[in-house]
Amino acid sequence: MEEHYDTMQILCYSLLPCLLFLLSTKFLLYKRKKRNLPPSPLALPIIGHLHLLKLPIHRTLDSLSKKYGPIFSLELGSYLAVVVSSPSLVEECFTKNDIVLANRPDFIGGQRILSYSKTTMGSVEYGELWRNLRRISAIEFFSTSRLTSLFSIRRDEVNILMRRLHSISSNGYAKVELRPMFLDLTSNVILRMVAGKRYYGEDLKDNVEARMFREILEEFFVHITMTNVGDFIPILQWVDFSPHLRKLDGLSKKMDMFFQGLIDEHRNDRERNTMINTFLTLQEQQPEYYTDDIIKGHILVMLIAGTETVATALEWAFANLLNHPEVLNKAKIELDTEVGDNSIEESDFAKLQYLQCIISETLRLHPVAPLLAPHFASADCTIGGYLVPAGTALLVNAWAIQRDPKVWDDPSSFKPERFESEKFGAYSLIPFGEEGELVLEMAWQRG
């Protein structure tokens, strides 16, 4: 009898996890149906759909959208996320629901190192500061007059790159790795515009200040791509299974000290035409709006948005041109016709229509951000007829939209000519972000 009791007890303990799993699954399905949430795969208790997110994530989400439709939801631990993959749904997000979706999710790593207490362009909550930062960016940093005034910086850095390539090939054809050269180019352009500094190049390898900055930025790009499990499962929020969070803290302090040094240096030299000095002038007029933390956060955002991203886009553009010699030849003919033997000026860009098509097609196939930066619903809203509850993270799969055969003819092929004749909706091409951010980014890239 005792043996029979032990057997029953073991059986009960064995069945209990299965029963809990079935009950929790049934509860989740009932709750989802009752609330009219977007369709979703079957979720596991606690982790939800985290086990489905295989790299590269934008391709995984594209596969899920083929099964569940252009809008579906995922439970990322304790977070509910909604993924959209169609131009019409993106338009609905950023027109009808633009204010509700203006904020960003709170992640530990992002808050500690990226946001300077949520005062950067990518983290600030919707409100007066949000409007101020966008207004200042549009007027002071991305306006046509501002970009034109800094043209000499971009020309200088391009000439330095051309001389470097000429030196390498002086004895005939030579194999070169363009990506590090493009990183040097884009980093120096941004740094000179922001702080009047050059930290990259063969002549600066032994410069102590330059080396310190390069090490900080290299470490930053390594750690910022890592995932913290506590962001999705709150009970593990303060358990650091790796030294990731501790390293982020240390990196944050080093970066903060370095940026503060740049600001203090500019306080003693107000003559330079830099973004930091522009901010310091605004700080004198409105110190409550333009604190040192806001300036440092803006420096960081500019470095993130304008270095790796632009270098990657340049690398893809050159790869596409080399793999499609007929496109390269057509671009050469346009340059010879419109510019001739003269050096290209920024005023020539409007005449180089085919070159613009090449840029657009490169960004369509290889968007700078395959998944746009996540947004956060500050209140309940509807997208595509489905409820998106307050607290939901919104993910836009730009990569999927820009390769959608319903939107693009022969979407996997590199065809710049498609931008000469075909007409596309406002949200069919979103390589940087929603419409407002796209305007700023395009001004920056073209500048």
Residue ranges of predicted features:
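Juxtamembrane membrane-interface segments of multi-pass membrane proteins
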Residues: 157, 262-267, 321-342
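Cytochrome P450 heme-thiolate "Cys pocket" and heme-binding signature region
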Residues: 421-447
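Conserved cytochrome P450 K-helix E-x-x-R motif and the immediately C-terminal K′/meander segment
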Residues: 50-69, 257, 265, 325, ...
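Cytochrome P450 catalytic-core helices
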Residues: 309-327, 332-334, 442-447
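Conserved cytochrome P450 K-helix/beta-meander segment immediately N-terminal to the heme-binding cysteine loop
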Residues: 396-423
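Terminal signal-anchor or tail-anchor transmembrane helices
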Residues: 2-33, 188
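Cytochrome P450 heme-thiolate monooxygenase catalytic core
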Residues: 106-114, 148-314, 330
